[in-house]
Structures are given as structure tokens and as C-alpha cells.
């Protein structure tokens, strides 16, 4: 097993960072690593906003659900779906492509491009001995996040990425068994296979939480996920995404 694979398999989310900020060189390396990710048809439909202003980080921390590691980290990055530059290019050349930019396919392209870039950055950061934590909470109140970051139409903040020097290492959460996520040639809908896999995984997760909390928590993955799914969804996003110029047709 090489160092790259070891880094990937050793991933865990870090939610406690030291006060040490990333250097300009480290930030540059991380951004270059993100840019090296694959991109659909060379469109590069994403942007990264680095947030170093302490007040902006504090505001984003509150908007993300009062998550302290949004404010206290080595550097905070926000990954955005970005079709603004493409719209600007078209306008400068007298082309009219708004309807094309605002369709579902381009929305999906921008989402995937941003996610690929972010994962490249994450792996690069962890290979440098840094820790990372993805922050989906910025989608709680995207209209206010947009104000903080001053993003124009055709730019949509998707998630944050806190990066820094770990203050402590959390345990690695067991992932779903391979047979739950990998299907050969066709999707496996066998009910018995599903039930066996989920029961086995639920016991693994229950044992993990019991050991981690000295018996104070024994929640299964099934219970955890179903409870999460029943929480109030961000239903406003459907309209807001369209308002920002995405997924209109």
C-alpha cells in the first residue's frame, strides 16, 4: 500500500484545531491541488473563496449552526458552483447563453466540479499532516452567506472546508461494507442481502459508539440516518438555487 492510499484510508473529520494559521505557501499548494482535479469538458465551473477575515469567519460559524471549527481553524475555504465567469465571457463576445448556463446539466457539472476540487484539496491537506472538516451547514441560510461572501448571480456557495493543524484526532468511523456500495454490472436489489448487510453494519456502528462513549451511546447507523432524514430539510433551496441562476430548465 502506497502513501497516497494510506492517507486516503486514514481520513477522519477534525473538529478541533490549534491556533496555528496556514502559511501562504500551504494555501497556495492546497488551491493548486484543488485545481488539478478532473473537470467536465474543461469547463472548470467552480470557485474557491478563502476566508481569513476573523469577523467573516465568526459570521459564517453562526450561520452554519454555531459550529466553532468554522471560526477556529488554520484557514476556511468555501467551494462554490460558478458559472459567472462563463456568463461574463459570453457577454464580452456578444453571445447569449443564459438559457444554456441555467439548465440542469450545467448545474450538475458545476456541483461535481466543485466536489472533485474539494476532495483533491482534502487529500492534499491530509498528506501534509493537516486535518479537514467539510461544512454543509453554510446551506442553512445561503442568502445570508451570499451577503457575507458577496457572491453574484451564477455563483452558489455549496459547502465549506475547514483546514488546520489538528488539536486532537477523533476516531475513524467505520464505513458501510463494500457490498453495500459496490455493485457489479447491475444494482443489487436483493432484500435478504440488504437486510444482512444493514444488520451487520448496525452492530458495527453500535459497538463503535459504545466503545467510544464508554457505554453512553449505542445508536445504530439506521436509527441515526433515519432521525437525520426526519429533520427539517432545507426546502428553500429549490427556489433559491433558481434565483441565483441555476437549474432553471
Swiss-Prot record:
Among Gene3D superfamilies, the record links this protein to: NADH Oxidase (3.40.109.10)
Task: State the protein's name.
Answer: FMN reductase (NADPH)
What role does it play? Reduces FMNH(2) to FMN, with NADPH as reductant. It also reduces nitroaromatic compounds, quinones and azo dyes.
Keyword hit for Calcium: no
The highest taxon in the source lineage is Bacteria
Q: Quaternary state and partners of this protein?
A: Homodimer.
- What are the protein's GO molecular function terms? FMN reductase (NADPH) activity
UniProt KW DNA-binding keyword: no
- In short, the EC number is 1.5.1.38
Q: Which NCBIfam families match?
A: PRK10765.1
Catalytic activity of the protein: FMNH2 + NADP(+) = FMN + NADPH + 2 H(+)
Tell me what else is known: Catalysis proceeds by a classical ping-pong bi-bi reaction mechanism. NADPH is more effective as an electron donor than NADH.
Similarity comment text for this entry: Belongs to the flavin oxidoreductase frp family.
Which organism is this entry from? Bacillus subtilis (strain 168)
Q: Which keywords does UniProt give here?
A: Flavoprotein, FMN, NADP, Oxidoreductase
Amino acid at each position: 500500500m502506497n502513501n497516497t492510499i494510506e492517507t486516503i484510508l486514514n481520513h477522519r473529520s477534525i473538529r478541533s484545531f490549534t491556533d496555528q494559521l496556514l502559511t501562504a505557501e500551504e494555501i497556495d499548494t492546497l488551491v493548486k491541488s484543488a485545481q488539478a482535479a478532473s473537470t467536465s469538458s474543461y469547463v472548470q465551473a467552480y470557485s474557491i473563496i478563502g476566508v481569513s477575515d476573523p469577523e467573516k469567519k465568526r459570521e459564517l460559524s453562526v450561520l452554519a449552526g454555531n459550529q466553532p471549527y468554522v471560526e477556529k481553524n488554520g484557514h476556511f475555504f468555501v467551494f462554490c458552483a460558478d458559472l459567472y465567469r462563463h456568463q461574463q465571457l459570453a457577454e464580452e463576445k456578444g453571445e447569449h447563453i443564459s438559457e444554456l448556463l441555467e439548465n440542469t446539466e450545467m448545474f450538475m457539472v458545476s456541483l461535481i466540479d466543485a466536489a472533485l476540487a474539494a476532495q483533491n484539496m482534502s487529500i492534499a491537506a491530509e498528506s501534509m499532516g493537516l486535518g479537514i472538516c467539510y461544512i454543509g451547514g453554510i446551506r442553512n441560510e445561503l442568502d445570508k452567506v451570499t451577503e457575507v461572501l458577496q457572491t453574484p448571480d451564477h455563483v452558489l456557495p455549496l459547502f465549506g472546508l475547514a483546514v488546520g493543524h489538528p488539536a486532537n484526532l477523533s476516531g475513524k468511523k467505520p464505513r458501510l461494507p463494500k457490498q453495500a456500495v459496490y455493485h457489479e454490472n447491475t444494482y443489487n436489489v436483493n432484500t435478504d442481502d440488504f437486510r444482512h448487510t444493514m444488520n451487520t453494519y448496525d452492530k458495527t456502528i453500535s459497538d463503535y459508539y459504545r466503545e467510544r462513549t464508554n457505554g453512553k451511546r449505542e445508536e445504530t447507523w439506521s436509527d441515526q440516518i433515519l432521525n437525520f432524514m426526519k429533520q427539517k430539510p432545507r426546502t428553500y433551496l429549490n427556489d433559491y438555487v433558481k434565483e441565483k441562476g441555476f437549474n432553471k430548465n
